[in-house]
């Protein structure tokens, strides 16, 4: 699995839309292997989604004038996905709202110079416990990944906060940038099927995007 780029095998070949075009918010989703339940979750938050292939250029996505950007879940090693790392860097540089889950979470870390590593035992299943450091509460999450973000390097970065940790092995389960509209989680916060007590990412993103000065976008 180390060094294997699998996203090109599962990503959509052409853009498509999901949700209500009259929704108050538009989100550009970068398809790294996106699940339909994630799209349904976004649509349920009154978000209109345009799903782009993983290798779409930033300029092409920006033309759609989304309110925010989303890096999806997906398979394989995040390190070979250089185009998506560069895409995340450009979004962050412009301070557009950006959030990611699973593989997208790892891409955001790599875009900030935080390395990832192959885990000895990956996290698989619907009952992975994490602690939310911002609320102090535990959450049961659905996870399916074999790579993780390097915690030691992340802890040394003054610009990023660890928001969630896995309770079994203390791996990073969530992060947030201090001065940018960017955050991510390592798990699948989906509405159905499975656990639904971790839907924070869509509601938080919607609130954040709605309150950010988007320059008329």
Language-model segments: residues:
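Internal, non-catalytic "lid/hinge" segments that mediate substrate recognition, gating
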Residues: 1-26, 36-40
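Flexible gly/pro-rich beta->alpha loop and the following alpha-helix that scaffold active-site loops
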Residues: 35-100, 112
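Pocket-forming structural segment of enzyme catalytic cores
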Residues: 85-99, 105-199
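Conserved small/polar residues in nucleotide/adenosyl-binding loops
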Residues: 201-208
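Hydrophobic alpha-helical segments, chiefly the membrane-spanning helices
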Residues: 213-217
């Amino acid at each position: 699995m180390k060094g294997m780029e699998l996203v090109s095998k599962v990503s959509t070949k052409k853009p498509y839309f999901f949700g209500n075009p009259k929704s108050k918010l538009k989100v550009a989703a970068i398809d790294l292997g996106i699940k339909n339940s994630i799209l349904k979750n976004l649509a349920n938050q009154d978000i209109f989604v345009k799903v782009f292939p993983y290798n779409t250029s930033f300029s092409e996505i920006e033309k759609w004038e989304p309110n925010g950007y989303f890096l999806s879940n997906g398979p394989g090693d995040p390190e070979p996905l250089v185009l998506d790392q560069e895409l995340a860097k450009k979004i962050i540089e412009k301070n557009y709202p950006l959030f990611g889950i699973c593989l997208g979470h790892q891409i955001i870390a790599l875009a900030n110079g935080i390395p990832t590593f192959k885990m000895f035992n990956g996290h698989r299943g619907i009952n992975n416990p994490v602690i939310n450091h911002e609320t102090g509460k535990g959450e049961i999450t659905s996870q399916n990944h074999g790579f993780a973000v390097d915690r030691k390097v992340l802890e040394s970065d003054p610009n990023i906060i660890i928001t969630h940790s896995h309770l079994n092995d203390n791996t990073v389960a969530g992060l947030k940038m201090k001065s940018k509209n960017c955050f991510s989680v390592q798990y699948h916060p989906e509405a159905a099927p499975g656990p639904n007590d971790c839907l924070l990412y869509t509601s938080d993103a919607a609130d954040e995007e709605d309150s950010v000065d988007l320059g008329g976008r």
